[in-house]
Amino acid sequence: KRAARTLAPFLFWSLLYWVRPFVLKQATAPMSAKGLFLAIFNNEANYVFWFFYCIFAVYMCLPLFSLAADKKNIKTIEYVCVLGFVFNSVLPLVNRFVIPVYGGLTPVIVTGYVVFVFMGWLIKNKDYTKKARILIYMSGIFGAALMFFGTYIVSKKGGETDTLFMDYTSIACLPMSAAVFTAAKYIKWERLFRIIPEKFIRA
C-alpha cells in the first residue's frame, strides 16, 4: 500500500513531464517507447524526481527488514545504525582527510538511504532518557553548524561547491535527522495543538 501511494504520483508526474515538451513543441527528439522507458526508469522526465527511485529501493527491502522489526532485536538494530554511521558518515571523512579505505568494505545492509529506516525504527521503539535526548539534540545542532561552516571551508579551499557535509548521510546531516526524529517522538503535540490549530500543523 505504501509503495502504491508513492508509485501513483511518480507515474503521473513522470508522464506529465515527459509529454510536456511535445505539447509545447520543445522536444529535441521524436516521441518513442524508448523515450518513455528512459523517462520512467532512468530519471529522464525531470531530474528532481531522483528521490522517488531511492524511496522505491528502500521499499523493496522492507519485507526483509520487517523480519527484524521486533523490540527484542533492538541491540541488533543499534549495531546496524552504528555501522551505518561509521561507513556512511565517518568513512568519507577518513577517505578525504586521513587515508583511502576501499569502498567495498561497506556492509551492503547500510548502503544508500536504508540507514534511515533502521534509525527511524530504533528511535520510535526505544525509550531515551532526557539526558540522551539532549545529547541527540546537541548532535543535531552540531551537524547543522558543521554543514554550514564545514561546507564553506572546504568549498572555499577547493574553489567550488563541495558537498562533503551536504550529503544526506554525511556526518552533518545524519545527526540532524536523528534530532528531528527524536523531537517528533517526544514533543508534546497536545500542548502544541492548544496554541496552533492541528489542521495548520498537519498541512
Model segments located where?
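Membrane helical hairpin/interfacial module
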Residues: 1-27
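Membrane-interfacial loop-to-transmembrane alpha-helix junctions, especially the N-terminal start
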Residues: 1-2, 6, 73-81, 131-140, ...
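Juxtamembrane loop-transmembrane helix junctions in multi-pass integral membrane proteins
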Residues: 2, 72, 103-106, 163, ...
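Hydrophobic alpha-helical elements at and bordering transmembrane segments
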Residues: 3, 41, 200-203
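Divalent metal-coordination and catalytic microenvironments
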Residues: 3, 55, 180
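Aromatic-anchored segments of alpha-helical transmembrane domains
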Residues: 14-15, 19, 81-95, 139-154, ...
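Hydrophobic alpha-helical segments with transmembrane-like composition
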Residues: 17, 21-25, 30-128
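Alpha-helical transmembrane segments and terminal signal-anchor/GPI-anchor hydrophobic tails
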Residues: 130-202
